[in-house]
Amino acid sequence: MKTTSEIRQSFLDFFHSKGHTVVPSSSLVPENDPTLLFTNAGMNQFKDVFLGLEKRPYTRATTAQRCVRAGGKHNDLENVGYTARHHTFFEMMGNFSFGDYFKHDAIQFGWEYLTSPQWLGLPKEKLYVTVYETDDEAYDIWNKIVGVPTDHIIRIGDNKGAPYASDNFWAMGDTGPCGPCTEIFYDHGETFWGGLPGSPEEDGDRYIEVWNIVFMQFNRLADGTMEKLPKPSVDTGMGLERMTAVMQHVNSNYETDIFQTLIKEVAGLLNVSDLDNKSLRVVADHIRACSYLIADGVVPSNEGRGYVLRRIIRRAVRHGNLLGAKEAFFYKLVPTLATVMGHAGEVLTQKQAHIQKTLKAEEEQFARTLERGLALLEDALTKVENNTLSGEVAFKLYDTYGFPLDLTADVCRERELTIDEAGFEAEMTAQRERAKASSNFGTDYNNVIKVEGQTDFIGYDNLEAQATIVGLFSNGKAVDTIQSGESAVIILDQTPFYAEMGGQVGDSGLISTEICNFTVNDTQKYGQVFGHIGQLTSGSLSIGDKVTATVHATRRIAITANHSATHLLHSALREVLGDHVAQKGSLVSENILRFDFSQPEAISKSQLEEIERIVNRKIRENIQVTIETMDIESAKKKGAMALFGEKYGDVVRVVGMTEFSIELCGGTHVQRTGDIGLFKLVSEGAVAAGIRRVEAVTAETAIEWLHNQQKVLQQSAEFLKADSNSLVEKIQQLQDKAKRTEKELQQLKDKLAAQAGSELVKQANKINGVNVVVQKLENVEVKSLRTMVDDLKNQLESAIVVFGTVADEKVNLIVGVTKDLSSKVNAGELVGAMAQQVGGKGGGRADMAMAGGSEPQNLDNALKFAEEWIQAKL
């Protein structure tokens, strides 16, 4: 029996033997396609090739592409674990022709691989094919050339309510490349329910699609017209998990070797004996998606891809909880996964430590709120009406306890309940509106500035240039002329001003003529043109005017030093912390550099010191900074780091500082690292789960920062009458003395409180034979209240004690009840009721509880209420 890894390799070997280039799987994070959340098909990495926007050095390709379908348009998450074939992560085997072969070869390649004894050797009678209803060419190839009998070929027409809307017609979008497709189905046999494709029973488990071959032969225009493409292409996809199920003679993907290994590993970790438990399937599926997403640079967060990852992890953790998990377990599956995935698991092995750290941290974080959230949900489920959980409760679980909506839906599904999703969305919308109301945005010129052509940037080597004004925009609209005093955006035909990109801020400076001065405060890119944003301080300017554009040189030099230092910092972080470090955001300004990066745990002081030492060592080495322009493939072979989420063209700019740092970058840089002068880290901390931020200063700013630190040190030493070298020792002595004094003071306060308590014993009232003390206290700290209550309870032996005090305009309440009375008078209930009287809230145990409030004027009423409440209970 062939393993999954053997089937994967045989597919690639077969198509390599047919002249195809084996192309590695692309990242799950699409590199050049903002329309996609995750890579979800083999053709994603070739999209620009099919559109004619990119050329590759080959016309035939084959891949084993890792894919994720969770979130966005293609979302299989809610079905995972409940069906035989839904997964969050899967592998799509594919072969592609870019204007090379077409239908004849594509069909015959597929049939040979599936049926030849040298390859998969499937029984021909077990295979059925579908073709688009009018695709006679494909039908004839299957029937007359391949030899598939007519009763095994099915024509499928427009079955989705519109022309060319069919299971057998594929389109990239409403316009663009499209064409008919032919699909191959495997018959699992009569023991499974289901009908042939196109029949009412087609959704059954008997006939399963294993391969889809798309013939891109048309270009659909906006009016619906179909034009023939000059070079038709082929895009195919064979689901590896489905084909493995066929080859291993099982009907469910979860019965195949990879999933069975993972399921048994989970069962062993959690001591589960029933291997058919759906939660085992969920966990086995989710560890694949989570591990590969983290390996490809995604970190759990509350936005975009990071939130989808968080949702999958939390769903897995919840199902682990159902299986009896009492501690973090999910991360322990990574080594087994890396092994069982074979060659495709190498990326997991390389990043195993990082993946496990990230998973463990996220699992432990969610575990802290999981039990409380489930308790709230269980309580809410007992009160549902019309078998529907309210959107308000679902939103509270999401907002307060971190429950993704699909996790709550999972629990409801198990109880045959639904969620009021409209109500949930209403709560989400209200929250977004509140957030939007708190923001204030100025004029957005992105949709306003429309200028033919492009701005040529000549600022790498020049800080001043002659240019022509080709566009003017003021008050949100295009104008021909601006006058003195007007704020505007000026577009030039060429410019030395750098527009904000890649984290580097835009340049400032001056645009001038002999009689006009326009102060440039910022430079931004709008499409292909650079916008110089500022104010005209004298004269007037019109479209067509010749001007001198001058960059603020001192500011540019400072920005440039910070940008080069950022590259050194990035490499130093990877050297000290590990290769998992990837840039997640940056700011390069004249005053400071800020760098956000993936890192699952806090960074120690010694690590920060080592990072700083490495950067300064590279600065002292005065390394020549090299800048080369080359094609993207050559840059990658050179080892250049591409930044997560950035889009690069075919030709890229590579900035190198020997082998220590090589990055793709369009920013400005120093000529030698010595020009940076000095590097000093000034802050480090977390900005989100799995994301840390460091800030640093360089050159003159770093020297000024050190001067200020020295000044603070000297002033502190003078104030404490100590030498700066013994300052730490002096502060430690003062701290120890302060702690002793504070302890002595607290002991005195407790003694006074005990004395006051003895006086209060004499003032105890009897209510139905029970000792009751209800008092408003003056000048008593909150810390002492509990001591006083405990002393009174001990002295009276059987009593109810209620104290109220005011400090800093806030009310503090405490209720103590001896254990013999706590079944009648619950301290938590009483203090909660009192808190409402003073505009607050609180609670606690039946024998001791505290609360606070913001309305001290109502304290007397609250104490009177307490007496009446106690009397009613007794």
UniProtKB/Swiss-Prot annotation:
Binding site for Zn(2+): 563, 567, 665, 669
GO molecular function, one term: aminoacyl-tRNA deacylase activity
Subcellular location: Cytoplasm
Known EC number: 6.1.1.7
Cofactor: binding details: Binds 1 zinc ion per subunit.
GO CC annotations, alphabetized: cytosol
GO BP, one annotated term: alanyl-tRNA aminoacylation
UniProt xrefs under SMART domains: tRNA_SAD (SM00863)
Secretion signal span: none
UniProt KW keywords: Aminoacyl-tRNA synthetase, ATP-binding, Cytoplasm, Ligase, Metal-binding, Nucleotide-binding, Protein biosynthesis, RNA-binding, tRNA-binding, Zinc
One Pfam family it belongs to: DHHA1
Cofactor: Zn(2+)
Domain of life: Bacteria
Main location (coarse class): cytoplasm
Catalytic activity: tRNA(Ala) + L-alanine + ATP = L-alanyl-tRNA(Ala) + AMP + diphosphate
Domain topic, free-text comment: Consists of three domains; the N-terminal catalytic domain, the editing domain and the C-terminal C-Ala domain. The editing domain removes incorrectly charged amino acids, while the C-Ala domain, along with tRNA(Ala), serves as a bridge to cooperatively bring together the editing and aminoacylation centers thus stimulating deacylation of misacylated tRNAs.
Function: Catalyzes the attachment of alanine to tRNA(Ala) in a two-step reaction: alanine is first activated by ATP to form Ala-AMP and then transferred to the acceptor end of tRNA(Ala). Also edits incorrectly charged Ser-tRNA(Ala) and Gly-tRNA(Ala) via its editing domain.
NCBIfam families the record matches: alaS
PANTHER family: ALANINE--TRNA LIGASE, CYTOPLASMIC, ALANYL-TRNA SYNTHETASE
UniProt similarity note: Belongs to the class-II aminoacyl-tRNA synthetase family.
Stated name of the protein: Alanine--tRNA ligase
Originating organism: Actinobacillus pleuropneumoniae serotype 3 (strain JL03)
Lineage of the organism: Bacteria, Pseudomonadati, Pseudomonadota, Gammaproteobacteria, Pasteurellales
